[in-house]
Structure formats: structure tokens, C-alpha cells
Regions:
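Hydrophobic alpha-helical connector segments
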Residues: 54, 65-96
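Hydrophobic/aromatic-rich alpha-helical bundle segments in the mid-to-C-terminal region
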Residues: 95-96, 107-118, 125-199
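Helix-turn-helix
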Residues: 8, 12, 16-50, 54
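Helix-loop "lid/cap" segments that line or gate small-molecule binding pockets
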Residues: 82-89, 100-104, 124-127
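Short helix-capping/turn signature of helix-turn-helix
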Residues: 45, 86, 100-104, 143, ...
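Secondary-structure edge/capping motif, primarily at the C-terminal ends of alpha-helices
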Residues: 70, 98, 102, 152-153
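Solvent-exposed, amphipathic alpha-helical segments
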Residues: 12-19, 62-70, 144-148
Length: 199
């Protein structure tokens, strides 16, 4: 019974946070919707922050585990982005909350962790000394994975073919265009190493 109430509170909190925002939802709102006292909510969760962590931490833990699994040996971008998408799809119900609620993004114990994970993912995609252009492409690739998960109306990503399409798009975002500064620098360096490029 207690475990069932715990899950009911968490599910209601997720629904309310997504509609009214974390800041706009109170413990009193949750208690009223469930027809219980605030004390009954506090019996299961010490605070609204505790509830938020109950919802968000499984996703953050899974991202940390996924990053850890893909550091040695270094993954290909496709392997990393595919694994990242799998984690996000597993926890898709909380992705919109993280992606759209400023209070959650700036939460003192959640925001820094999200930013650190994003930095780790960028570094795995580009290397530690990447150019600004490469970092921008990495951000675009990560956005290509995130954004479709919060599209309205929701997109069907249960089909493996759709997931492959999404990963293909993210990998493509990592490739420099012909006019990219990175490509011009590489071409200049290669030219300098040829006999015609030597002084």
C-alpha cells in the first residue's frame, strides 16, 4: 500500500510539474489532488525537492553510467549518440521536465550535474581541445537527440528505424561542411606539407 502511494505521488508530481512547473506546484496541490493531507505527502517525501530528485535522478544516474561505459575504449560518435538516445528513451517521461522547466535546469543540485554531463558528452564527441566550430557541431548533435523527444505532437520513436534516422541526423551534424573553418585549416595544413606548399 505504501509503495503504491509513493508511486501515485511521484506520478502526480511529474504530471503537475510538466503542466504547472516545479515552482508552480505545491505540496498542498498534490495533497488536494490525491485527497490526502499534506502530512501524508511528507510521510513519503520530506520536501518538494525530494520529489524532484525521485523523478530526475534515475535519468541522471543512467546518463552517468552510460558516459562511464563509453570512456574506455573511446566510442565512435554513433555508438555514443545511440547509447545516449537509448537512455533518454528509457526515461522519456521526465525529459520534457528537464528540457523546458527553467527552475529544474537551474536547480542547485540538478543544474550543475546536467551541465557537467553535457560537457562530458561534448568532450567525448569532439576531444578535449576542440575548436569552437567543433563544439558547436557537438551541441547541434546533442540537440538533435534531445529535441525530437519533446516535440509536440509527440513523435513515435518506438520504431527502431526512426531511432536510426535520429542518430543518423545527429552524426551528420558533427561533420564539417565544405565551407567550415575546420576544413579550410586542415586543407591549409595539408598544402603546407606538400612540395608546392613549402617555401
Amino acid at each position: 500500500m505504501e509503495e503504491r502511494m509513493d508511486r501515485r505521488i511521484a506520478q502526480l508530481a511529474l504530471d503537475r510539474f510538466r503542466v504547472d512547473g516545479f515552482v508552480g506546484t505545491s505540496i498542498a496541490d498534490l495533497a488536494g489532488a490525491l485527497g490526502v493531507s499534506k502530512a501524508a505527502i511528507y510521510y513519503h517525501y520530506r520536501s518538494k525537492d525530494t520529489l524532484l530528485h525521485r523523478l530526475i535522478d534515475p535519468l541522471l544516474d543512467a546518463i552517468d553510467a552510460g558516459i562511464g561505459d563509453h570512456t574506455t575504449p573511446a566510442p565512435t560518435p554513433r555508438q555514443l549518440l545511440s547509447a545516449y538516445l537509448t537512455v533518454l528513451l528509457t526515461h522519456r517521461d521526465v525529459v520534457p521536465l528537464i528540457a523546458t522547466d527553467v527552475a529544474v535546469l537551474n536547480h542547485p543540485s540538478i543544474g550543475p550535474r546536467l551541465r557537467a554531463q553535457n560537457q562530458q558528452l561534448r568532450t567525448l564527441l569532439t576531444g578535449p581541445d576542440a575548436s569552437v566550430a567543433a563544439r558547436l557541431r557537438a551541441e547541434a548533435a546533442l540537440g538533435a537527440i534531445w529535441r525530437p523527444l519533446i516535440a509536440e505532437p509527440p513523435l513515435d520513436l518506438t520504431d527502431r528505424a526512426h531511432q536510426h534516422t535520429l542518430v543518423d541526423a545527429a552524426v551528420a551534424a558533427l561533420r564539417p561542411s565544405r565551407s567550415s573553418p575546420d576544413r579550410r585549416l586542415v586543407a591549409a595544413a595539408q598544402s603546407a606539407r606538400t612540395p608546392s606548399g613549402r617555401r
